[in-house]
């Protein structure tokens, strides 16, 4: 009756029927066993498992291990509590059979812990330490049995696992099958922040399986993960996401964990013994899934409220504890203190009152001089740190504005209130503007482009020999958000303010093409500097070889064999001396030693200045050279706004070719106006309007600089921003009419044609905006060549720009030439220019390519059968011959056949009629 009442209490009626069925079937099972005894039954199960595992332990040791290690997370717990825990699991299992959607599924983040680098290192180190101690123990026992000595072999003392753990910690590369922080190369300052906050969920098996549901945005990720900064394509879609701005990951040491566990257990056991022993109809209290007590249902709400208050007051010495009240027939209080949990702060609602509103006057007076930790100490009940499980089972109001508008009866239903919507985005998404005013895909594309934006200079750019691209004259953005300001991303700038105009320019700026002003480029507009590392390893004998070689590549080297500082390297120049010498085995040659240059060359299309040279002398000479190059915008370079309005330079126009306004101001960049409508980026227009408003009123009433807050996600209407801009222009130009003020507010400007000096018939949208330059540079991607290196096997051009390869001329390009009838060009491109042609002899009997034996062409297949062969010479490419040979080696016969017809000189000549045709 106890089991029946415990499993069916506060459950739907259909579950009660199933519980009765389970109990009755168990009774019937017991009746079938003669003289049933529970101890004997369990003992038989252990013996059966012992025989199944073929354990090397004796039976008593195996039995002791099985019983003691049952439910290992409750190892020190009495067996009675273990039994109650099994009943709680059975209760949840039965409930989830009927109501599968009520409890977190496999893909819910409630069921996941993020494995950070430190935690992974700790797991590897613990496992290796256990193996290390176990190996030493086993070796001592074996040596004592065999030789009677207590010695340890030297190979047992090696620690390859520790070496693997430390190398993984330093390199950030553990096994790919575990979800953990991800690492990438850093191209900009933004990636230093965004990449460590990128979390992967699932192992590699998910990427190749047909599991599409796990790639969807799971509801449990709301408020803790950025919904915008996700991969838009590739195998990582839906499997990797960024933490939101306020989200962090818990971390706790073992000694802190044990101390905190002891404090919480003492607090729970401070309740009356009868109130925490309701194992039949009470609420189970678990601490990290370990059953502690079962609480009186009448005390549940008061217990949770009191526990949360004590937690906020730091009674337990830890503010990151998660306490979750699971109602809905589950009847469980879950307390979590472990590491790897996702946590973030929320505003506290107590009995229908927002605590922040009650102490607002006192908090507002001190807020300028307080940090987040100070608020938690002085006003502990304002903010609560909540983990993702507590958030899932709590009633959370999405904004303060919505909560204040609710009636009192509705307010009492909520436990927590969220911060403004911009803090649900990640750091990358928070650098965008007005995501909620644009179409959905713009946010995802904007995050991807924002990571590619070139940021400001590093502090040690000249001494750090590494690849990097840096903006020379960065500017702090005027339109920012709270997240952008507090994270210091705004201070570490990533773009410049430029004047743009939305118009068509002679049909040049079609699609993504933009027009950029030549004088803007010459004055350093969006100018960058490229730092590039060139590293070579040279054998010591080659580096010290003083033999002279006829090579113009050594013109920039000094006498020590290294490139000169401040030398300008061009394509083909050597980085360092590398001369290989070889002795010819020929007694008739007086000078039988030849030397040739095998040095690594500088391969970039543009000249670069040598900034630093480092040399490491070991068994090989390791030379590292840092080169610098100023890179002004050129045709094909890529730019974008913060609303994912990307564009490439289609034309660099002189200012005499550009239109101008009544003040003579000319746009720095001209963008295709139709891109706004096709991509639906309304927030780009709002950003221009707000930046223009800052231009006329950059200071507040106290005379201090006043950036404009236009966050990535917000609940403010567009009319509010337009009214703000209108007031700024009205204060600056009080005498203008409403129409003129509206023109200035909406950045509608009359531009004049530079050729006729007459105004255009319609007004042009022109104003300032924060513009970004991306790391996709034309000169870094040009791979056209007409001659160069070839591969040894197939004698075709190398693949890849770094290896001196060119653009592949493939099937589609060939089809274009066929359409033009350019037969000779096809022959030259596909056969003569880049490949080695080869004459081969083919046997007309079997179609095999002949072999050359002692200078004679022989068909091996026909010669073994003593057949007479007819060999035909075929002019083909070397790669075709290699392909046929490899197919034959794999057991695939490729037969070359010829058209059966007589040669042309055997054809009878046409009869020529010599009679005169005028008769």
Swiss-Prot record:
> What molecular function terms (GO) are annotated for this protein?
DNA binding; DNA-directed RNA polymerase activity; metal ion binding; ribonucleoside binding
PROSITE patterns, per database record: RNA_POL_BETA (PS01166)
Q: Which keywords label this protein?
A: DNA-directed RNA polymerase, Metal-binding, Nucleotidyltransferase, Transcription, Transferase, Virion
Q: What InterPro entries does the record point to?
A: DNA-dir_RNA_pol_su2 (IPR015712), DNA-dir_RNAP_su2_dom (IPR007120), DNA-dir_RNAP_su2_hyb_sf (IPR037033), RNA_pol_132_poxvirus (IPR024390), RNA_pol_bsu_CS (IPR007121), RNA_pol_Rpb2_3 (IPR007645), RNA_pol_Rpb2_5 (IPR007647), RNA_pol_Rpb2_7 (IPR007641)
Q: Which Pfam families match?
A: RNA_pol_Rpb2_3, RNA_pol_Rpb2_5, RNA_pol_Rpb2_6, RNA_pol_Rpb2_7, rpo132
- Record's catalysed reaction(s): RNA(n) + a ribonucleoside 5'-triphosphate = RNA(n+1) + diphosphate
Subcellular location, in the record's words? Virion
What is the protein's quaternary organization?
The DNA-dependent RNA polymerase used for intermediate and late genes expression consists of eight subunits (147) kDa, (133) kDa, (35) kDa, (30) kDa, (22) kDa, (19) kDa, (18) kDa and (7) kDa totalling more than 500 kDa in mass. The same holoenzyme, with the addition of the transcription-specificity factor RAP94, is used for early gene expression.
Similarity remark = Belongs to the RNA polymerase beta chain family.
Please state what the protein is called: DNA-directed RNA polymerase 132 kDa polypeptide
Q: Which organism is it from?
A: Sheeppox virus (strain KS-1) (SPPV)
